[in-house]
Structures are given as C-alpha cells and as structure tokens.
C-alpha cells in the first residue's frame, strides 16, 4: 500500500485540538486496512517526525434516512491517534 493512501485527512475537532495542545497527539482518518506499523511509517515519512505511539479505532458508520422510507448508512472508517516525541510538531492548517 502506498503511504500517501494510508493517511486520508486530519481530524480537526475541539477534542482533537485539546489533545494536540496538552499531549502532543494528532488524530487522522486512515485507510481501514492499514495497521499501526504502516500508519507509524507513513506519518514519520510524510511529516518528518518521530512517532512515539499509535492507537487505532474502527468507527462504525451511522444509519441515515434516505428518502421517505428507505434507510442508508454512512461508511465505516478508521481513526488513528498518533503521539509524537518531545519537541516534535506537525504543521497543519489550524492557524488559518
């Protein structure tokens, strides 16, 4: 798997920003088939940082109402919380 396809996008929520400021942890949406070793290698290669640990979570898609009677579902996705070493930082577009 190509490392550019492992990390899809960062998650920028209030909780994710607090984790970044307090614990130096960054949250990403990643490919569902990626494991922790692949995620660690992708983050270290793409952002030139040293990763201390990776925690992953499979998130189940919620049910939606599509039309008047039909039900649909959002896609399942995978979340990765990456902790960096001291002095490491990833420049995201959070200063816009």
From Swiss-Prot:
Family the entry assigns: Belongs to the universal ribosomal protein uL23 family.
Pfam family membership, one: Ribosomal_L23
SUPFAM superfamilies: Ribosomal proteins S24e, L23 and L15e (SSF54189)
Taxonomic superkingdom: Bacteria
Role of this protein: One of the early assembly proteins it binds 23S rRNA. One of the proteins that surrounds the polypeptide exit tunnel on the outside of the ribosome. Forms the main docking site for trigger factor binding to the ribosome.
Membrane-spanning residues: none
Keywords tagged on the record: Ribonucleoprotein, Ribosomal protein, RNA-binding, rRNA-binding
Designated name of the protein: Large ribosomal subunit protein uL23
Quaternary structure annotation from Swiss-Prot or TrEMBL: Part of the 50S ribosomal subunit. Contacts protein L29, and trigger factor when it is bound to the ribosome.
GO biological-process terms attached to the record: translation
GO molecular function, one term: rRNA binding
This protein's GO CC annotations: ribonucleoprotein complex; ribosome
């Amino acid at each position: 798997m190509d490392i550019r396809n492992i990390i899809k996008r960062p998650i920028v929520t209030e909780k994710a920003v607090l984790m970044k400021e307090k614990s130096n942890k960054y949250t990403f949406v990643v490919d569902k088939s990626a494991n922790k070793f692949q995620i660690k290698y992708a983050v270290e290669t793409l952002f030139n940082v040293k990763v201390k640990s990776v925690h992953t979570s499979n998130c189940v898609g919620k049910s939606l109402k599509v039309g008047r009677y039909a039900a649909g579902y959002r896609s399942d996705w995978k979340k990765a919380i990456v902790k960096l070493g001291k002095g490491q930082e990833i420049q995201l577009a959070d200063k816009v």
